[in-house]
Curated annotation (Swiss-Prot):
PROSITE patterns xref list: PROKAR_LIPOPROTEIN
Protein name as catalogued: Uncharacterized lipoprotein TP_0503
Keyword GTP-binding set for record: no
UniProt keyword annotations, A-Z: Cell membrane, Lipoprotein, Membrane, Palmitate, Signal
Amino acid sequence: MYAGGRVVRSAFARGKVCYLIGSVLWGSVSCTQPRVQKWVQNDGKVNVHSPQERAGVVATFGTVRITRSDYERTKAELQDVVAHLNRITAERDYHKWLVYLSDAYRRAYSMPDILQQSSDALPKKGVRLRHLRDYFIHVFVPSRQNVRVDSIVFESPTRVDVIMNHGGKALLVYKIEKIHSAWKLLP
């Protein structure tokens, strides 16, 4: 998934501001109580709104606001995408999987150094990943069994992190972006 740890400020989720901490394969989400935010309108005046005043808005990116209905619609779309990915994973269908990859994902997981790092991290020693197909078979398929969408976090109006709760932890299972009206996996 996302290489290297980073903290990303994201949307309001159930009245709390969440921070996503990415790691090599999984991430976690921690939340703190919301603070009053400053929003700049087009006329240049700064208005201060509490989260209660913006109850219908879950994220803002410049002048673009993601509403609760946008959130629910996007979550439903991503539940369908993840259901398709679950079937593809169960069937080990490499060619159908390729349809869901962004160009950046294909490039990243075709790079020799990334494939070598992934080979070194595999529990089964002696497996050498040489191609994207090897990554799919030995890394993606075993790590993406029965994924579900418990929540989503908007990184931008088109980029979303898919979160699954497991064992009391929130796990980042997919970074995904809407590209030309289709959801594509990001590295």
